[in-house]
């Protein structure tokens, strides 16, 4: 019985290590609306959805939006910009821009609806706002760690700015999507098997 119990422990440990070695990409999603804007909600019927996927050091940003009251900023004299991810703050307040400024490269400008996708290397300074790097030790690694921690803690938000709402027309807090529960189910099964072994041993081998 000890050998079987030991084998179960070994299998569990191997599964855990395999999970670390072959970690699934981290996925975060946000539903964007004017009501989510802070400190003042925006009176906008606009809606949007954003997905941020982090696979190793590569981040993929995908977003779609529609129904904005005003067009996304196109670098007009107002100084507003189209879209960013801000870090690090809860949904009740605001934070500085973490991602490239003045906006995500290639984000649709001068429109009330659109879609976007792009990839960023989180080990490059060009993937961040210089001010965010300076605020986190002055290094790209410091910015990377702070940004990832913000994502995983639910302290980042996706914000789309328009000419009518330079502070942001629609916003959504990025929330982590739970990872597959494979290891949890495996762990539950192993625990159940171990309990059955112990019970059988106490019963003297009787079923």
Label the model's feature ranges.
Residues 19-23:
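Sec/Tat signal peptide C-region and signal peptidase I cleavage site
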Residues 8-16:
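Bacterial N-terminal signal peptides
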């Amino acid at each position: 019985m000890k050998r079987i119990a030991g084998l179960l422990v070994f299998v569990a440990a191997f599964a855990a290590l395999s999970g670390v070695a072959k970690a699934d990409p981290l996925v975060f999603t946000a539903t964007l609306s004017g009501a989510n804007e802070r400190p003042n909600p925006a009176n906008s019927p606009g809606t949007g959805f954003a997905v941020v996927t982090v696979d190793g050091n590569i981040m993929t940003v995908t977003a779609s939006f529609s129904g904005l009251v005003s067009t996304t900023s196109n670098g007009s004299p107002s100084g507003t910009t189209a879209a960013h991810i801000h870090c690090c703050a809860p949904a009740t307040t605001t934070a500085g821009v973490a991602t490239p400024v003045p906006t995500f490269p290639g984000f649709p400008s001068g429109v009330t609806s659109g879609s976007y996708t792009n990839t960023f290397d989180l080990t490059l300074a060009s993937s961040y706002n210089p001010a965010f790097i300076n605020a986190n030790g002055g290094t790209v690694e410091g910015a990377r760690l702070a940004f990832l921690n913000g994502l995983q803690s639910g302290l980042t938000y996706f914000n789309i700015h328009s000419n009518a709402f330079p502070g942001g027309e629609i916003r959504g807090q990025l929330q982590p999507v739970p990872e597959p529960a494979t290891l949890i189910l495996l762990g539950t099964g192993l625990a159940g098997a171990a309990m059955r072994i112990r019970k059988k041993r106490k019963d003297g081998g009787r079923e």
